[in-house]
Amino acid sequence: METRYNLKSPAVKRLMKEAAELKDPTDHYHAQPLEDNLFEWHFTVRGPPDSDFDGGVYHGRIVLPPEYPMKPPSIILLTANGRFEVGKKICLSISGHHPETWQPSWSIRTALLAIIGFMPTKGEGAIGSLDYTPEERRALAKKSQDFCCEGCGSAMKDVLLPLKSGSGSSQADQEAKELARQISFKAEVNSSGKTIAESDLNQCFSLNDSQDDLPTTFQGATASTSYGAQNPSGAPLPQPTQPAPKNTSMSPRQRRAQQQSQRRPSTSPDVLQGQPPRAHHTEHGGSAMLIIILTLALAALIFRRIYLANEYIFDFEL
């Protein structure tokens, strides 16, 4: 198998390491890749004690993506159990249905312990979940020991080590329960954060809608009051613009654009009359006055020249 894959690939390195760590079965779980496919594993887990699955041995498949461990695997149960559908990708916080909660530090062993820890929990309508009665689950637990996988040839009777009553078994059970609790809490935190963000966004949209729904008379009175405070000189007030009829099919972005266009200041002549003269108007007035003075001075010089010429002619005739 090693010659068929690129040993420099992070996914291949990781899966080779995990295959060596999980080579020996335990009394609670076992998993190994297929001989011809490193990215498909078959696993076997024992049902958690003190539950409806006590005494059951369940078999399934784990399909890993090429981006593993950056992306989560897909988990498929092959043994009827009453908690997960057979032959369908189940929806867990460690499966491909929830890549947002997956952590690259998790491994296939983490997935096996999570499956054991999630089996006694309620499905709550998740994809691939079932809610059989306790009697049906106990019957399926007894029947699961006779299952034999055609893909890998594993028989449930001898694939796991015999169950022991000791610290090792109880430690594995506690680890599975604690892992399932932590994963469930992480998923709840992520979903609650997403819900809060969506509620804030909806509240923002509803606030914009409430501004659109204000009565026309109230909007006109508000505009008149604000303009009177800014223009105490008594200039004629501009007539408030009637808003266009609200279109319920408009998107939030279109509604915001419409509001911004309505809030732009008016540029009517009445409003411009109340504005103070600009500075460049004074500069133009000074230039015009200077031109007039120079013109008058030039005219005076011309008249003086004409007067002196006429006076010289009069003296010459005398």
Curated annotation (Swiss-Prot):
Kindly give the Pfam families that the UniProt entry links to this protein: UQ_con
Q: Which PANTHER family match?
A: UBIQUITIN-CONJUGATING ENZYME E2
After translation, how is this protein modified? Phosphorylated at Ser-184 in a cytosolic stress-dependent manner by MAP kinase p38 MAPKAPK2.
Source species of the chain: Mus musculus
EC id: 2.3.2.23
Assembly and interactions? Component of the HRD1 complex, which comprises at least SYNV1/HRD1, DERL1/2, FAM8A1, HERPUD1/HERP, OS9, SEL1L and UBE2J1. Interacts with E3 ligase RNF26. Interacts with E3 ligase RNF133.
Q: Where in the cell is it found?
A: Endoplasmic reticulum membrane
This entry's Gene Ontology molecular function terms read: ATP binding; ubiquitin conjugating enzyme activity; ubiquitin protein ligase binding
InterPro entries (UniProt xref):
Ub_conjugating_enzyme (IPR050113), UBQ-conjugat_E2_core (IPR000608), UBQ-conjugating_enzyme/RWD (IPR016135)
* Topology feature Lumenal, residues: 304-318
Which SUPFAM superfamilies does this UniProt record tie to the protein?
A: UBC-like
Where are the membrane-spanning stretches? 283-303
- Describe the task this protein carries out: Catalyzes the covalent attachment of ubiquitin to other proteins. Functions in the selective degradation of misfolded membrane proteins from the endoplasmic reticulum (ERAD) and is essential for cells to recover from ER stress. Plays a role in MAPKAPK2-dependent translational control of TNF-alpha synthesis. Also acts as a platform for perinuclear positioning of the endosomal system by mediating ubiquitination of SQSTM1 through interaction with the E3 ubiquitin-protein ligase RNF26. Plays a role in male fecundity through the interaction with the E3 ubiquitin-protein ligase RNF133.
Please list the residues that make up the active site.
Answer: 91
Q: Give the pathway.
A: Protein modification; protein ubiquitination
Reactions that this protein is recorded to catalyse: S-ubiquitinyl-[E1 ubiquitin-activating enzyme]-L-cysteine + [E2 ubiquitin-conjugating enzyme]-L-cysteine = [E1 ubiquitin-activating enzyme]-L-cysteine + S-ubiquitinyl-[E2 ubiquitin-conjugating enzyme]-L-cysteine
Question: What does the sequence similarity comment in the record state about its family?
Answer: Belongs to the ubiquitin-conjugating enzyme family.
UBC core domain location: 10-168
What keywords are assigned to this protein? Answer: ATP-binding, Endoplasmic reticulum, Membrane, Nucleotide-binding, Phosphoprotein, Transferase, Transmembrane, Transmembrane helix, Ubl conjugation, Ubl conjugation pathway
Q: Topology relative to the membrane, per the entry? A: Single-pass type IV membrane protein
Record's compositionally biased regions (Low complexity)? 249-269
Q: How is this protein named in the record?
A: Ubiquitin-conjugating enzyme E2 J1
Instruction: Give the knockout phenotype.
Output: Deletion mice have reduced viability and fail to thrive early after birth. Specific components of the ER dislocation machinery are up-regulated. In addition, males are sterile due to a defect in late spermatogenesis.
Q: Which PROSITE patterns match?
A: UBC_2 (PS50127)
